[in-house]
Curated annotation (Swiss-Prot):
This is Crossover junction endodeoxyribonuclease RuvC. Mg(2+) 1 binds at residues 7, 141. It comes from the Bacteria. SUPFAM superfamilies: Ribonuclease H-like. Mg(2+) 2 binds at residue 68. One of its GO terms (molecular function) is magnesium ion binding. The active site is at 7, 68, 141. Binds 2 Mg(2+) ion per subunit. The keyword DNA repair applies. One of its GO terms (biological process) is DNA repair. Homodimer which binds Holliday junction (HJ) DNA. The HJ becomes 2-fold symmetrical on binding to RuvC with unstacked arms; it has a different conformation from HJ DNA in complex with RuvA. In the full resolvosome a probable DNA-RuvA(4)-RuvB(12)-RuvC(2) complex forms which resolves the HJ. It comes from Streptomyces coelicolor (strain ATCC BAA-471 / A3(2) / M145).
Length: 188
């Protein structure tokens, strides 16, 4: 499975591609950061975000895209920029028919480090170890993008099984309750 991880941001977004399957060693295919000037017009910045993501999609041909789910922050301006960059990444992937998964920061940290409260240094150290890199990717946004891809590779099989079970249950329709034996409380 090849996954493009996107750590969204309007000024700087980490992008990383990881290939592998759960339970086997993973391989980093590429990692980087797409930047936009903070003083540029919003429309131009979003176009630059789109062009950067499209370039990564063209070059690396991922099967899935994993994007960090935007969470509430105190700085509304930061949340808005992150949400806008996230939407562009989702749009680019969806336009190509590539499935998109959203993962929360704590979900990614827990998957990669074992703790949903891990700091950036701990995430970077585990990404370095898991991908057998010589040094942690810099800046931290790049390491976060790789962590998103790793999280998706590890969690996708379980999520797929759960979705299949729900789909099967839904397709079968509602089940009739068993009639209980009046004196024993067991099915008759």
């Amino acid at each position: 499975m090849r996954v493009l991880g996107v750590d969204p941001g309007l000024t700087r977004r980490g992008i990383g591609v990881v290939e592998g399957v759960a339970g086997r060693p993973l391989t980093m295919i590429g990692v980087g950061v797409v930047r936009t000037p903070a003083d540029a017009d919003l429309g131009h910045r979003l176009v630059a975000v789109e062009q950067g993501i499209e370039q990564w999609l063209d070059e690396h041909r991922p099967e899935f895209v994993a994007v960090e789910r935007v969470f509430s922050q105190h700085n509304v301006r930061t949340v808005m920029g992150t949400a806008q960059a996230s939407a562009v990444a989702i749009l680019c992937a969806s336009r190509r028919g590539i499935p998109v998964a959203l993962h929360t920061p704590s979900e990614v940290k827990a998957a990669v480090t074992g703790s949903g409260r891990a700091d950036k240094a701990q995430v970077g150290a585990m990404v370095t170890r898991l991908l057998r890199l010589a040094a942690p990717p810099k800046p931290a946004d790049a390491a976060d993008a790789l962590a998103l891809a790793i999280c998706h590779i590890w969690r996708a099989p379980a999520q797929n099984r759960l979705q299949q079970a729900v789909a099967l249950h839904t397709a079968q329709g509602p089940r009739r309750p068993h009639k209980l034996h009046p004196s024993k409380g067991r099915p008759a």
